[in-house]
Amino acid sequence: MSFEQLFADVFGFPQELVKDELGFREVPRWDSLAHMMLIARIEDTYEMQFTGDEIADMKSVGDLRKSLRAHGVTV
């Protein structure tokens, strides 16, 4: 499953609109609970783990991708 598919699946958001500049304010369902659901799905899918600071700093799709790349994940 691609990162875009994963994001779209968690938020019920059109996959083609998943762009780096997309932030939590533009996705109505991106609240704190959904954010943690997304993090759990990402960690399970890519077999890695974010730090608490990384999770707190994720405010956009671009932030998510940057953190994934820092963990060696190609997205």
Predicted regions span which residues?
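Short, cationic-aromatic polyanion-contact patches
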Residues: 63-67
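Thiotemplate assembly-line natural product biosynthesis machinery
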Residues: 1-16, 69-75
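An alpha-helix initiation/capping motif
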Residues: 1, 58-62
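Short alpha-helical elements of helix-turn-helix
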Residues: 1, 33-36
